[in-house]
């Protein structure tokens, strides 16, 4: 029996990155032998075991053969005779197809170390095209390692373009899992850009893909492509925060500008894009079973984000509406989230630093004014039942009016 450290742990060690988790491959063993020495079997499709002390995963070396469509259409074969080189051959990218043996020697039959030096994401073998999930994985790795100047090998990108017809065989959960992982990288915009380059964006996220045909007239700049503008905005959001709700809402904020393409003039100012976007976000989130917390914040942001840039001129009633729809009184962190959404817009805020800071301060101050109104005081004053909420609204509105009058 030989044990090898494999995959991401080896790659990250060579890149001098923190190793998050360790995966192992066992050569020369059998399921029964693993059980006999105290390992716990957890894999259903192929033999994977948990170490009795470290609880790290140990998989028996295996080969895979394509048997049907999708990423699950494989027949796995395990046997004591399967070598580490055969096991590594089934992996997606050369940088993920390396191992360390028990003596610390690097096993690198497919030149992963070379591609790390070249900063290339290159497929291991022709069998790459058999698993459509690899299109998403490569796009995610491109996003994850963009700050290290990794690029996709041209021959790998060609294969990805040939694989997109099988993408719809992937489960919605699997697509969202890869997308979520990409969204929390330092450069999530790279993930969607890669998907567009290989044709996958049009299949999986047609709402996003449509934006690349639409210009965005703004008062701050000349007409620019809405798709690229969205990618720039997502990049700015990723720089500002790790909050996936903020990042996703920024990604989806302008979806309404992309439809209906056959009815909207490409030179339109998209007056109705906010409401159009709500339906698109709802459908997209349902399609991929995206968590309610993320989808709800994104839908609200789509409808109300334009108001966030003009806090100074908003009437108290509109400020109250904003605080209500974003549920700020019960969830004060929402104020930080919506400010981050507004700060992510690179065009609106460019060269307007003092103005933008003032808008942010005004929004925070306005919310603080309303938050000081206590329900306890209202109850002490004798209000009961539904009259409590009505009086709470009235007092908050009055406080905002008084505050606004002092700003003039």
From Swiss-Prot:
Entries under Pfam families matching the protein: PolyA_pol, PolyA_pol_RNAbd
Source species of the chain: Blochmanniella pennsylvanica (strain BPEN)
GO biological-process terms attached to the record: RNA repair; tRNA 3'-terminal CCA addition
Binding residues annotated for Mg(2+), in chain numbering: 21, 23
EC number(s) recorded for this UniProt protein: 2.7.7.72
Protein biosynthesis keyword on record: no
SUPFAM superfamilies the record matches: Nucleotidyltransferase, Poly A polymerase C-terminal region-like
Cofactor or coenzyme needed: Mg(2+)
Binding positions (ATP): 8, 11, 91, 137, 140
Family: Belongs to the tRNA nucleotidyltransferase/poly(A) polymerase family. Bacterial CCA-adding enzyme type 2 subfamily.
Domain HD stretches: 226-329
Protein name: CCA-adding enzyme
N-terminal signal peptide: none
Catalyzed chemical reaction(s): a tRNA precursor + 2 CTP + ATP = a tRNA with a 3' CCA end + 3 diphosphate; a tRNA with a 3' CCA end + 2 CTP + ATP = a tRNA with a 3' CCACCA end + 3 diphosphate
Gene Ontology terms for molecular function: ATP binding; CCA tRNA nucleotidyltransferase activity; magnesium ion binding; tRNA binding
Additional detail: A single active site specifically recognizes both ATP and CTP and is responsible for their addition.
Lineage: Bacteria, Pseudomonadati, Pseudomonadota, Gammaproteobacteria, Enterobacterales
InterPro entries: CCA_bact, HD_domain, NT_sf, PolA_pol_head_dom, PolyA_RNA-bd, tRNA_CCA-adding_enzyme
Residues at which CTP binds: 8, 11, 91, 137, 140
Keyword ATP-binding: yes
NCBIfam families documented for this protein: PRK10885.1 (NF008137), PRK13298.1 (NF009813)
Function: Catalyzes the addition and repair of the essential 3'-terminal CCA sequence in tRNAs without using a nucleic acid template. Adds these three nucleotides in the order of C, C, and A to the tRNA nucleotide-73, using CTP and ATP as substrates and producing inorganic pyrophosphate. tRNA 3'-terminal CCA addition is required both for tRNA processing and repair. Also involved in tRNA surveillance by mediating tandem CCA addition to generate a CCACCA at the 3' terminus of unstable tRNAs. While stable tRNAs receive only 3'-terminal CCA, unstable tRNAs are marked with CCACCA and rapidly degraded.
Alphabetically ordered keywords of this record: ATP-binding, Magnesium, Metal-binding, Nucleotide-binding, Nucleotidyltransferase, RNA repair, RNA-binding, Transferase, tRNA processing
């Amino acid at each position: 029996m030989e044990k090898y450290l494999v995959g991401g742990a080896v790659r990250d060690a060579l890149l001098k990155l923190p190793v998050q988790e360790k995966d192992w491959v066992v050569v020369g063993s059998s399921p029964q032998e693993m059980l006999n020495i105290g390992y716990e079997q957890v894999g259903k499709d192929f033999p994977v075991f948990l170490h009795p002390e470290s609880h790290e995963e140990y998989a028996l070396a295996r080969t895979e053969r394509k048997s049907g469509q999708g990423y699950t259409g494989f027949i796995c074969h395990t046997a004591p005779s399967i070598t580490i080189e055969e096991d590594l051959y089934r992996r997606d990218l050369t940088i993920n197809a390396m191992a360390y043996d028990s003596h610390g020697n690097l096993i690198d039959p497919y030149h992963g170390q070379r591609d790390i030096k070249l900063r290339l994401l290159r497929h291991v073998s022709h069998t790459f095209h058999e698993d459509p999930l690899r299109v998403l994985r490569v796009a995610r790795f491109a996003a994850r390692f963009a700050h290290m100047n990794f690029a996709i090998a041209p021959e790998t990108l060609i294969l990805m373009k040939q694989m997109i017809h099988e993408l719809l065989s992937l489960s919605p959960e699997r697509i969202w899992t890869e997308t979520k992982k990409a969204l929390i990288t330092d450069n999530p915009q790279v993930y969607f850009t890669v998907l567009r380059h290989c044709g996958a964006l049009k299949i999986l996220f047609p709402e996003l893909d449509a934006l690349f045909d639409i210009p965005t007239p703004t008062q701050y700049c000349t007409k620019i492509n809405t798709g690229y503008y969205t990618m720039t905005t997502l990049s700015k959001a990723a720089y500002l925060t790790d909050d996936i709700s903020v990042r996703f809402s920024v990604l989806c904020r302008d979806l309404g500008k992309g439809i209906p393409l056959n009815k909207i003039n490409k030179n339109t100012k998209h007056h109705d894009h906010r409401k159009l976007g709500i339906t698109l976000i709802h459908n997209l989130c349902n399609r991929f079973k995206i968590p309610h917390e993320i989808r709800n914040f994104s839908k609200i942001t789509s409808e109300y984000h334009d108001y966030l840039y003009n806090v100074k001129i908003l009437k108290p009633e509109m400020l109250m509406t904003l605080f209500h729809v974003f549920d700020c009184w019960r969830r004060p962190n929402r104020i930080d989230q919506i400010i981050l959404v507004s700060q992510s817009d690179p065009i609106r805020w460019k060269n307007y630093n003092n103005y933008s800071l003032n808008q942010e301060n005004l929004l925070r101050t306005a919310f603080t004014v309303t938050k000081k109104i206590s329900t306890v005081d209202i109850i002490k004053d004798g209000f009961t039942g539904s009259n409590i909420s009505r009086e709470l609204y009235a007092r908050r509105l009055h406080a905002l009016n008084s505050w606004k009058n002092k700003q003039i």
